[in-house]
């Protein structure tokens, strides 16, 4: 009986000795949640201040307004912000596009599409945003183009889905600039373009 106890004890000691380096390498013992590392010097996505003015400024260039609803506690928001939203502002396919961010937990005031000043959190609630990140594309009248992009379930296709949403927004901007006969009825001056 003592031979069994001795070999069981030796086996457990060996298992512990050899598995400790593997566990340390794999960080199995860590109590910390996995976080995406974001460069401290990362560019910032501008906060929305006046959605009506920002959407009209984008429309001056034939582009929609792209808004990311996020929160400070959302690690996936950092991924969407750094990999998609910030690069979007300099994407040559969308000259003049404007992308902004709203914090769903913030009481910071922002002007909505009707010109009324509301807290960012109230604006998020008005648009039914409860999960973040959530990206929405808007035309110059504040109408949402297509479906929102909620979360980031598949990074391989996220850019494709974002492009689809933006293209729907571009179509909305272009159709807002035409009468029912198809003739242009809105000039860039109608949006107070610079």
Predicted regions and their residues:
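N-terminal targeting signals for export/organelle localization
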Residues: 1-44, 188-194
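Short active-site neighborhood of thiol/selenol oxidoreductases, capturing the structured segment around
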Residues: 61-74
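Solvent-exposed loop/turn segments at secondary-structure junctions
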Residues: 72-76, 84, 104-109, 142-143, ...
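Non-catalytic, surface beta->alpha helical segment in thiol-disulfide oxidoreductase systems
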Residues: 126, 130-131, 136-171
């Amino acid at each position: 009986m003592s031979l069994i106890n001795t070999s069981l004890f030796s086996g457990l000691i060996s298992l512990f000795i050899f598995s400790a380096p593997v566990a340390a390498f794999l960080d199995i013992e860590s109590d910390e949640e996995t976080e995406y590392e974001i460069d401290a010097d990362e560019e910032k996505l501008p906060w929305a201040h006046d959605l009506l003015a920002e959407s009209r400024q984008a429309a001056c260039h034939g582009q929609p307004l792209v808004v990311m609803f996020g929160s400070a506690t959302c690690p996936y928001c950092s991924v969407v912000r750094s990999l998609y939203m910030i690069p979007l502002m300099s994407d040559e396919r969308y000259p003049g596009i404007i992308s902004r961010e709203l914090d769903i937990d913030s009481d910071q005031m922002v002007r909505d599409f009707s010109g009324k000043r509301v807290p960012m959190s109230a604006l998020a609630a008005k648009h039914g945003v409860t999960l973040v990140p959530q990206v929405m594309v808007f035309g110059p009248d504040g109408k949402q183009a297509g479906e929102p992009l909620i979360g980031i379930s598949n990074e391989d296709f996220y850019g494709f889905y974002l492009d689809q949403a933006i293209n729907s927004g571009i179509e909305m901007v272009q159709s807002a600039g035409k009468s029912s006969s198809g003739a242009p009825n809105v000039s860039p001056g109608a949006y107070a373009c610079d």
